[in-house]
Amino acid sequence: YAKNRVQFGKPIASFQAIQHHCANMLLYVEGSRHITYKTACLMDEGRSSKIRIATAKGWVSEAYKRVIALGHQVGGGAAIMTEHDLTLYSRRAKAAEVAFGDAAYHRMVVASSLGIHE
């Protein structure tokens, strides 16, 4: 979208703020992918722990929300239209939060596992 949307005579992807948002989205996605694969690999080997799993779930949950928010900022008004997939991703993120717990819940699980949460 950022490459195709033109504002002030040039694609919005040429603006530094948009570039930073897109770069941050990539960092969140790649970080989530890494921690998910690492945790899955450790689980497959039987070397995972409750803390590692909760950490991965918490990171991915928070990253998903941030990527959605940045996507809405990059997309502007178009991002809230049902014709764009971002609205579907927003609904899925909320449903996943309800079904699997949000980042705050998973931070609480980590703290409890460390013995620092009541």
Sequence positions of predicted segments:
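Alpha-helical interface subdomain recognition
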Residues: Y1-E118
